[in-house]
Amino acid sequence: MDLGLKGKRAIVTGATRGIGRAIAETLADEGCHVGICARDPVSVEATIASLAGKGVTATGRALDVRDGAALKGWIAAAADALGGLDILVSNVSAMAGASGDEAWRRNFETDLMGAVHAVEAAVPLLEKSGAAAIVQIASIAAIEVGHDVFPDGYLQVYGAFKAALTNYIAELARTLGPKGIRANTVSPGQIYFPGGVWHRREQEGNPMHRKALARIRLGRFGRPEDVARAVAFLASPAASFVSGANLVIDGAFTRRVN
C-alpha cells in the first residue's frame, strides 16, 4: 500500500535511538522530509546524515525538550527548513525513576510539557497543511496496572504521565478536528533494541525480562519498527478518518478491552 507520505514534512522528537529513530527512518523511507531533535549533538548529526542519505531533506538540533522556548523555536526553524509541516510525532520521554519528587518533576517537564509545548508550536503550522496529523507515543503503562511483571508502584510516575498524554491527545482530536488536524496515540508494550531498557534487563538477568516475555502472547518482544510502521500509517492520508484513537502495540500483553 502506498501510504501517500511522499513529500510530507514531519518532525519527530527524541529521534536518535530506539522507537524515535525507527519512526524517523520509516517516515524518510516513505518519502517524508524529516526534522529531528534529541539531547546528544553527535547522535543528532549521525541521524540527520542517515536520513539525508535516503534522498529526503533532513534537519535537526540538539536540545532538551524541558526548555520549552528552545523547543518551540526549533520547531519553527525546522518547519521553515522543511518548507512547512504536516506531521508531528511526540516521542521523547524521561523514563525517570519509580517515585520521588525528582521523578515526578522530570516526567512532568519532559513527557507532558514537552508534548504540550511541541503541539503548541506545531498547530499553527499544521493548520496550513490540509492533511495534518499529530501522533503521540504513550505506553501500555497508561492503560493497565497491577500485573505481575513489575513490582507494585514501579510504573506509577511513568504511567501517570502517559495516561495524561493519552487524554490530552483525545481532547486534541476533538478541538483540532475542525481545523483539519488529526490526533492519535500509539501505546507500545515491551520494545527491545540494543541499549534499550529491555536489553539492559536481559543483560542484567533481571526477572522482569523473563516475566514480560512469558506474558506476551506472540512470544517475542516488539521491535522499534513495529511501532514505527503503525505511526507511519496513522500519520498518513491512508488513516484520514482515524482520529482520537489509541493504538496498542504489545503483542497481546495487555488484557484490557480497548
PLM regions and their residue ranges:
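The beta1-alpha1 cofactor-binding region of Rossmann-like NAD(H)/NADP(H)-dependent oxidoreductases
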Residues: 41-42, 62-74, 101, 225-226
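Substrate-binding pocket helix/loop in short-chain dehydrogenase/reductase
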Residues: 96-108, 154, 212
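Catalytic loop of short-chain dehydrogenase/reductase
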Residues: 95-98, 135-164, 169-178, 190
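Short, small/polar-rich loop/turn modules that mediate ligand/substrate recognition or access, typified
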Residues: 177, 182, 242-244
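Short C-terminal tail/terminal secondary-structure segment
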Residues: 2, 232, 243-258
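Conserved glycine-rich cofactor-binding loop
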Residues: 16-17
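A glycine/serine/threonine-rich, flexible loop-to-helix segment
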Residues: 1, 49, 53, 149-151, ...
